[in-house]
């Protein structure tokens, strides 16, 4: 009887661990927002504003070659 209880315990722990990992993965979603879309991007301002407002990472990225860069902020949703 002890062998059945021990193996059942380990199976339940394995199932519980898998569900815990799945829930954690769902919570790690990342969002992206364009900050001040019409304004030219200053890299230092972009980084500081994104971190202060969203606790994220800001980068100046041009949507197409030849266009001015926009401040793209990536943060946890």
From Swiss-Prot:
It comes from the Eukaryota. Disulfide bonds join 31-77, 41-60, 46-71, 50-73. This is Putative defensin-like protein 157. It is found in: Secreted. The gene is LCR22. GO terms for biological process: defense response to fungus; killing of cells of another organism. Residues 1-27 form the signal peptide. Keywords: Antimicrobial, Disulfide bond, Fungicide, Plant defense, Secreted, Signal. Coiled coil: none annotated. Pfam families: SLR1-BP. One of its GO terms (cellular component) is extracellular region. Belongs to the DEFL family.
